[in-house]
Amino acid sequence: MFLPQEIIRKKRDNLTLSQQEIQQFVAGITDNSVADSQIAALAMAIYFNGMELEENVHLALAMRDSGRRMHWKDLNLPGPIVDKHSTGGVGDVVSLMLGPMVAACGGFVPMISGRGLGHTGGTLDKLSAVPGYNPFPEPELFRKVVKDVGVAIIGQTSDLAPADRRFYATRDVTATVESIALITASILSKKLAAGLDVLVMDVKAGSGAFMPTMQKSIELAERIVKVGNGAGVATTALITEMSQPLASTAGNSIETREAVRYLKGDQRNPRLHEVTMALCAQMLIGGKLAADEADARAKLQAALDSGRAAEIFGRMVTALGGPADFMEHYDRHLAPAPIMRPVYADRAGYVGAMDTRGIGMAVCALGGGRRLATDVLDFRVGLSQFVELGQNIGKDTPLMMIHAADEASFEDAARRVKAAIRIDEAAPSELPLVYQIIRGE
């Protein structure tokens, strides 16, 4: 007989749960036979006592199996099923370039993405700025686009890992979001449901990261790599820098515009380019599409230089309902904000530090992000042309450009971004873009 309270008691007492106990509890989350209070109690017990590696694998797999699983074998695809997941940040537009770049090199990328919440932008919101783009296609259309184009970026549907959605909603209101075991199971349940062969994780560190310290970022990356590999997906993680916005823009339409310009070769922010190439390279190596880092980077550069990656992005947009001429006339399709003006520093000096989370919250306050999951976005607004850490600036140097809907929101954003940037007498030491690569053993 299944008694949720006995499973809670075991974990409360720091004992190891069996695969059957975990499967029973997750089934109860899915069919509502387990109460919210019991989910909360188990979450708190796991928060304090953690999970053994094997328990964590069983939890991720049980949540994967709570809903529909995608299968690709029947399509006889001539390459591996690969994907990337980021813990999120500001100006993290990597997915929009990475998907088509990897597809151009022979990978198949069924990317299931999320919307933004709080200071972090969401890949889905950036693509939703494209007129007509359907982020929730029928499963057969999704499979067709992955097969024919090589990449499809869509949103999570209610039938994928439904246990995770209920578990997360409970964690969100019970101060248990930060549990590394539960973050790991939550991320991997959705990725495992997508039927991947290879997963590369981008775990951010710095003032705009989800994890509060470098040590916590490393702990999360190591756990995801171990659990992912334990669940049968070749998983690698990169710890990447998020002490300043990654791209030259933060917002929805403006980040999508930057992604198109990157793919077409019109503008490539060096920091964004390096992180994108590093993540793509690990996907190609993991999928056996490249022998090593140098081989992978050469193939990726060729995909950009030939225009193949840009062509694939355009085909994906069109296949999912967007304009057929999007790549040629993206400026016509992505509406600008009514107000676009710079904000200046109060004094000269070096850009010493950035509160990247604060910069993300400025985008949110402009209307480009969500405080609540139900908020409606203004795709036009955001920030661009950021100064960079270590840059020597004068009082006449713009800190960034603000794209606002009205004067009041411009003034509010200006106050926020000025407060988020520290000007020092001396330049800070340079930070690496990729701190560490963590591979499965």
From Swiss-Prot:
GO terms of molecular function: 1,4-alpha-oligoglucan phosphorylase activity; thymidine phosphorylase activity
Coiled coil: none
Annotated metabolic or biological route of this protein: Pyrimidine metabolism; dTMP biosynthesis via salvage pathway; dTMP from thymine: step 1/2
Protein keywords: Glycosyltransferase, Transferase
GO cellular component assignments: cytosol
Keyword Transferase: yes
InterPro entries: Glycosyl_Trfase_fam3, Glycosyl_Trfase_fam3_N_dom, Glycosyl_Trfase_fam3_N_dom_sf, Nuc_phospho_transferase, PYNP-like_C_sf, PYNP_C, Pyrmidine_PPas_bac/euk, Pyrmidine_PPase_CS
Domain of life: Bacteria
Catalysed reaction equations from the record: thymidine + phosphate = 2-deoxy-alpha-D-ribose 1-phosphate + thymine
SUPFAM superfamilies (alphabetical): Nucleoside phosphorylase/phosphoribosyltransferase catalytic domain, Nucleoside phosphorylase/phosphoribosyltransferase N-terminal domain, Pyrimidine nucleoside phosphorylase C-terminal domain
GO aspect biological process, one term: thymidine metabolic process
Protein name listed in UniProt: Thymidine phosphorylase
Taxon lineage: Bacteria, Pseudomonadati, Pseudomonadota, Betaproteobacteria, Neisseriales
